[in-house]
């Protein structure tokens, strides 16, 4: 049997399960999950290697009108990804009542690319068969799809069927990554994303969008099984800094505790996590600051 390989983009509006699906296929947490828009800022790769295929999933930033240079970067990353991959998974919620504004924008973008597409109806376990059939008809009337698959990424329902359809559409090709690799991003990047996820989950809508995380130290002690991590949380306003720190430092302590617990599970080692908060005004419009915070502007 010929070996298949290729790059698969995941696109969809916020909170439809893109990151959950990629993390499910890869078998570990690669991409952070949050109900807030613009959670994913970079194209994050999750690598699944099987006996007969290697699939590189790419969780793309959402398609949205940019409000600053960071927003422009995210849109460019998403558009570039859609043009370069072998297959696009367009993910929508099976419980949706119709095609909303976010999906209208995504459909328009997808019309511009000739890449094969699969429509994935996620959260099918929560939807009626009638609603699923209505959505299939609505979306297939707007765009041509190779397959339409209903799944539940949270528990893996029908994901095996989706996987087989993905393999069917991928070209024959080589292994691009070693068998044991599940992502190509640095460990320090995953650390910064997990910290940012905890900020997204704990704070109100306004603050998280202006937050970036820089990991200054990531080192394992020679004499003890302890991983020392030092990171700085950057925000754009003094008022946001006060909110992140919280009364008596309680919010920062909560964010740090949640991040540390997840990092210890991820790395299988005790983690000593130190967090600081600094203000860098308008960093999302500052190219140098964006580079410092890990946004690879050369990609776009």
Swiss-Prot record:
Region ranges (G1): 12-19
Domain KH type-2 per the UniProt entry, residue ranges: 195-281
Gene Ontology MF term list: GTP binding; GTPase activity; ribosomal small subunit binding; small ribosomal subunit rRNA binding
UniProt xrefs under SUPFAM superfamilies: P-loop containing nucleoside triphosphate hydrolases, Prokaryotic type KH domain (KH-domain type II)
GO CC, one annotated term: plasma membrane
Cystine connections: none
Region G2, annotated ranges: 38-42
PANTHER family assigned to the protein according to its UniProt record, in alphabetical order: GTPASE ERA, GTPASE ERA, MITOCHONDRIAL
Record protein name field: GTPase Era
Organism annotation: Caldicellulosiruptor saccharolyticus (strain ATCC 43494 / DSM 8903 / Tp8T 6331)
Native organism taxonomy: Bacteria, Bacillati, Bacillota, Bacillota incertae sedis, Caldicellulosiruptorales
Gene: era
């Amino acid at each position: 049997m010929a070996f298949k390989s290729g790059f698969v983009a995941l696109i969809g509006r916020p909170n439809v399960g893109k990151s959950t699906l990629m993390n499910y296929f890869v078998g570990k947490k690669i991409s952070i999950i949050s109900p807030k828009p613009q959670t994913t800022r970079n194209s994050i790769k999750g690598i699944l290697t099987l006996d007969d295929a290697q699939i590189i999933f790419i969780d793309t930033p959402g398609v949205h009108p940019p409000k600053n240079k960071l927003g422009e970067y995210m849109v460019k990353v998403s558009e570039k990804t859609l043009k370069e991959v072998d297959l696009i998974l367009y993910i929508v919620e099976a419980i949706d009542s119709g095609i909303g504004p976010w999906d209208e924008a995504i459909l328009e973008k997808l019309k511009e690319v000739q890449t094969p597409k699969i429509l994935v109806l996620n959260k099918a376990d929560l939807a009626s068969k009638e609603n699923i059939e209505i959505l299939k008809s609505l979306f297939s009337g707007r765009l041509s799809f190779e397959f339409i698959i209903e799944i539940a990424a949270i528990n893996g329902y029908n994901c095996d069927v989706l996987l087989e359809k993905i393999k069917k559409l991928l070209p024959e090709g080589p292994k691009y990554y070693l068998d044991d690799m599940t992502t190509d991003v640095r460990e320090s990047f995953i650390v910064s994303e997990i910290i940012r996820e905890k900020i997204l989950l704990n704070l109100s809508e306004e603050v998280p969008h202006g937050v970036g995380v820089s990991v200054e130290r990531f080192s394992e002690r020679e004499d003890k099984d302890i991983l020392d991590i030092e990171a700085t949380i950057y925000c754009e306003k003094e008022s946001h800094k006060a909110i992140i720190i919280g009364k008596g430092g309680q919010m920062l302590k909560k964010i740090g505790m949640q991040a540390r617990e997840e990092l210890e599970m991820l790395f299988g080692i005790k983690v000593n996590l130190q967090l600081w908060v600094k203000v860098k005004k308008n960093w999302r419009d500052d190219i140098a600051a964006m580079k410092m915070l890990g946004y690879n502007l050369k990609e776009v």
